[in-house]
């Protein structure tokens, strides 16, 4: 039902305006943004997903800035670079554009990983801070043709975050510390941006 609702909105948008459209899916850590973005793109012709997480600052830079223990907070991303890529994706429809992704094994962004060919009609981007209204993040919202906020029940969402940290090799105590100190602090920031969405969906 959630995917069907989103598909209907996207098809209405595509029928109403020509050219490439940008769909943004925001939500707290663990809400299911990546899963929904991939599912949406799979149902559409000529669609590509471009994650915000490709704009994480490199670990060496986070250490230099003293922000490594807050990785995932708004100031640990190249937000201006992300907005610039979205603008280029909107405007450069006659060439292949390469977007970065995030490698969860390396725990680092990887440049030039996602090709966006000229015939791409829909860009689906997802991440925590697409609706944040503080500079330079506010540039992102202005570039989206449809802004979606995805929420989820806290219990399953947090369980998923804990499982994610366990998969990285953290012991239970370290996983809980990271999730409740970092991920959940970021979740509160993200939840405050939900009112800036065009469409709100909930994953039960």
Where do the protein language model's features map onto the residues?
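Hydrophobic positions on the alpha1 helix immediately C-terminal to the Walker A/P-loop
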Residues: 36
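Conserved lysine of the Walker
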Residues: 33
């Amino acid at each position: 039902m959630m995917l069907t609702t989103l598909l209907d909105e996207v098809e209405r948008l595509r029928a109403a305006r020509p050219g490439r459209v940008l769909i943004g899916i925001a939500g707290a850590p663990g809400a299911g943004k990546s899963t929904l973005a991939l599912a949406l793109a799979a149902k559409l012709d000529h669609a590509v997903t471009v994650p915000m997480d490709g704009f994480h600052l490199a670990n060496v830079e986070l250490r230099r800035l003293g922000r490594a223990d807050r990785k995932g907070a708004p100031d640990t991303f190249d937000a201006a670079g992300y907005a610039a890529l979205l603008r280029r994706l909107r405007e450069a429809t006659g060439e292949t554009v390469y977007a970065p992704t995030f490698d969860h094994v390396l725990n680092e962004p990887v440049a030039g990983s996602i090709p966006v060919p000229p015939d791409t009609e829909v860009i689906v981007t997802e991440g925590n801070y697409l609706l944040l209204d503080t500079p330079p993040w506010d540039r992102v919202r202005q570039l989206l043709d449809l802004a979606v906020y995805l929420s989820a029940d806290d219990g399953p969402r947090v369980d998923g975050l804990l499982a994610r940290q366990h998969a990285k090799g953290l012991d239970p105590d370290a996983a809980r510390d990271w999730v409740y100190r970092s991920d959940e602090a970021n979740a509160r920031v993200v939840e405050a941006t939900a009112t800036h969405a065009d469409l709100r969906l909930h994953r039960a």
